[in-house]
């Protein structure tokens, strides 16, 4: 198998891994509910936490991050030493992210990408991920609004990625693409924030 074919296979596998809807799976098996029918209807950690408590929300967050981390690490291992290793590793990361947003298993209706994006940043730009996580904690702690923390943390992650990797790195531009998609997926949250109607978390 050529390096290019292997890279494309890994990209496809990354998408399928990213498509695994852990929020829906845990919601059904642990809570006996479809999380798409409760709260905000989102399949991510925040809505699962609202429906089933903080511990279940954290479990979904970790699993949603892991479904990006694992494919990226596998791609790095299998593509090590090949000419397009960095490019295909970044494409695997993007594929896992797109899989979470548009999962084939759920009719292409997925989550908002924050936890999966965090998993990607943790592997590709760890210091940027750390800065983003701290920013999320501060912003969320100050407002108790998850979307404020998510958007703030994402912005810092992207800035940190460009600082760490420069303007010519595929990692930096992949980070910018992730951030743009996260903002798009949060457009309703942004509208509610502008109107002062975004809900605060109580878990």
Swiss-Prot record:
Its main location: membrane. One of its GO terms (molecular function) is acyl-phosphate glycerol-3-phosphate acyltransferase activity. It is found in: Cell inner membrane. GO terms for cellular component: plasma membrane. GO terms for biological process: phospholipid biosynthetic process. The chain crosses the membrane at residues 5-25, 55-75, 88-108, 114-134, 162-182. Coiled coil: none annotated. The keyword Plastid does not apply. It is a multi-pass membrane protein. Pathway: Lipid metabolism; phospholipid metabolism. It comes from the Bacteria. Keywords: Cell inner membrane, Cell membrane, Lipid biosynthesis, Lipid metabolism, Membrane, Phospholipid biosynthesis, Phospholipid metabolism, Transferase, Transmembrane, Transmembrane helix. SMART domains: G3P_acyltransf. It catalyses: an acyl phosphate + sn-glycerol 3-phosphate = a 1-acyl-sn-glycero-3-phosphate + phosphate. Its EC number is 2.3.1.275. Catalyzes the transfer of an acyl group from acyl-phosphate (acyl-PO(4)) to glycerol-3-phosphate (G3P) to form lysophosphatidic acid (LPA). This enzyme utilizes acyl-phosphate as fatty acyl donor, but not acyl-CoA or acyl-ACP. Probably interacts with PlsX. Belongs to the PlsY family. This is Glycerol-3-phosphate acyltransferase. The lineage of its organism: Bacteria, Pseudomonadati, Myxococcota, Myxococcia, Myxococcales. The gene is plsY.
